[in-house]
């Protein structure tokens, strides 16, 4: 038997990271944990290092690194602790690493994910923001390095499974009419739009089907998550925005579909558990056991579908517009959303003001073509500044 694959998990203390470790632990003959990163959750990262004994761990700064290194030394664990952006990129691009799970939430995950791609790794992409922000540059780096990119978002993983292997030649050439991107609709799917201004962070984070972190839970509630996924799908599958249709499917059993010109529609179904796409991407093109129970269709009983309401979910409309504009617009959309969601979670703004901030940023800053990574990062900074100015002007 060949040696176990060495895996780095960027964002190990988050929900995707923990689910990845759960799957990896079921297959010790196939995978070794090489590095774990967890910027702000020192106690959780220490516990993971005690359990999985990685060669490296990465935290946010030197002070935290010293604390964790001393703790692990006292624990008798030989893990070496690195820090900062440089540490993240080092463990993502390390020559001994085979697989990188890119699960850092938000723009912070862009540079290490890009480092993994440029180093030719098998990259399991859960950090959708990396593609949203730098799509053209990211895909060019992928082509140049020969890296393998496998989507972890349940929707994109489903689309990947439903497409023919040669889809990169163009969706039209392989008979694809459109991609049907499913969405649960989140906790506010049936709420009257005029009541949304009073919802709390706790309500927004109470997703009906999925267990997720706070930021992505708010994105799901606003359907910005689906907007980001629409942009990601365009880059992953070489689709135009009009070829990606969002469909609300409350049960979250069908994870997405592909509609072909002959009238066939292929769908991927499964229980709403992220270990399924994680296991699929880890083992692809093989299959491994994930710990997810078999889907009981008789218990599900029914599958419902409806169109999203733009009045209830303006963030989805804003994301589609950014996808159509292109250039730095998606990066600015993402940055404005990150600022707005953080403000909402800290009770500085109302839920409905998330879209107001994003709209203000996109109207204030013109999109420009992205020639290099600095173009993307500069657009990100400008958008955050404008979003911060909105908060200041409105006394938040």
Curated annotation (Swiss-Prot):
EC numbers on record: 1.1.1.267
Catalytic activity, reaction form: 2-C-methyl-D-erythritol 4-phosphate + NADP(+) = 1-deoxy-D-xylulose 5-phosphate + NADPH + H(+)
Cofactor(s) recorded in Swiss-Prot or TrEMBL: Mg(2+); Mn(2+)
A Pfam match: DXPR_C
Pathway: Isoprenoid biosynthesis; isopentenyl diphosphate biosynthesis via DXP pathway; isopentenyl diphosphate from 1-deoxy-D-xylulose 5-phosphate: step 1/6
Binding residues for 1-deoxy-D-xylulose 5-phosphate: 128, 154-155, 184, 207, 220, 225-226, 229
Record-level Gene Ontology MF annotations: 1-deoxy-D-xylulose-5-phosphate reductoisomerase activity; manganese ion binding; NADPH binding
Record keyword Oxidoreductase present: yes
Binding positions (Mn(2+)): 153, 155, 229
UniProt binding sites for NADPH: 13-16, 127, 129, 213
Enzyme class: oxidoreductase
GO biological process, one term: isopentenyl diphosphate biosynthetic process, methylerythritol 4-phosphate pathway involved in terpenoid biosynthetic process
Keyword terms of this UniProt record: Isoprene biosynthesis, Manganese, Metal-binding, NADP, Oxidoreductase
Function summary: Catalyzes the NADPH-dependent rearrangement and reduction of 1-deoxy-D-xylulose-5-phosphate (DXP) to 2-C-methyl-D-erythritol 4-phosphate (MEP).
Assigned protein family: Belongs to the DXR family.
Protein name per Swiss-Prot or TrEMBL: 1-deoxy-D-xylulose 5-phosphate reductoisomerase
Species, as recorded: Stutzerimonas stutzeri (strain A1501)
């Amino acid at each position: 038997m060949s040696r176990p694959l060495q895996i780095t998990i960027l964002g190990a203390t988050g929900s995707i990271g923990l689910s990845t470790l759960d799957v990896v632990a079921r297959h010790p003959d196939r995978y070794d944990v090489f590095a774990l990163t967890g910027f702000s959750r020192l106690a959780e990262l220490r516990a993971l290092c005690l359990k999985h004994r990685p060669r490296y761990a990465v935290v946010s700064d030197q002070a935290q690194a010293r604390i964790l290194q001393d703790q692990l030394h006292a624990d008798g664990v030989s893990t070496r602790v690195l820090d900062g952006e440089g540490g993240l990129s080092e463990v993502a691009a390390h020559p001994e690493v085979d697989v990188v799970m890119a699960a850092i939430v938000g723009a912070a995950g862009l540079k290490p994910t890009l480092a993994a791609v440029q180093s030719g790794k098998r990259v399991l992409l859960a950090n959708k923001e990396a593609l949203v922000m730098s799509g053209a540059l990211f895909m060019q780096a992928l082509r140049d390095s020969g890296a393998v990119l496998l989507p972890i978002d349940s929707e994109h993983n489903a689309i990947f499974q439903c497409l023919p292997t040669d889809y990169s030649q163009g969706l039209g050439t392989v008979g694809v009419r459109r991609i049907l991107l499913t969405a649960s609709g989140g906790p506010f799917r049936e709420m009257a739009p005029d009541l949304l201004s009073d919802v709390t962070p706790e309500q927004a984070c109470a997703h009906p089907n999925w267990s997720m972190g706070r930021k992505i839970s708010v994105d799901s509630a606003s359907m910005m998550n689906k907007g980001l996924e629409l942009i990601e799908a365009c880059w992953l599958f070489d689709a135009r925005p009009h070829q990606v249709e969002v469909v609300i499917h409350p049960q979250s059993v069908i994870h997405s579909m592909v509609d072909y010109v002959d009238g066939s529609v292929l769908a991927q179904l499964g229980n709403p558990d992220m270990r399924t796409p994680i296991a699929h991407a880890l083992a692809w093109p093989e299959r491994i056991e994930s710990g997810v129970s078999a889907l009981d269709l008789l218990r599900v009983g029914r599958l419902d579908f409806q169109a999203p309401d733009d009045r209830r979910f303006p963030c989805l409309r804003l994301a589609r517009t950014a996808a159509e504009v292109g250039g730095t617009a998606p990066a600015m959309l993402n940055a404005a959303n990150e600022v707005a969601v953080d403000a909402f979670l800290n009770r500085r703004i109302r839920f409905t003001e998330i879209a107001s901030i994003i709209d203000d940023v996109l109207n204030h800053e013109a999109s420009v073509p992205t020639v290099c990574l600095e173009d993307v990062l500069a657009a990100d900074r400008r958008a955050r500044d404008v979003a911060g100015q909105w908060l200041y002007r409105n006394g938040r």
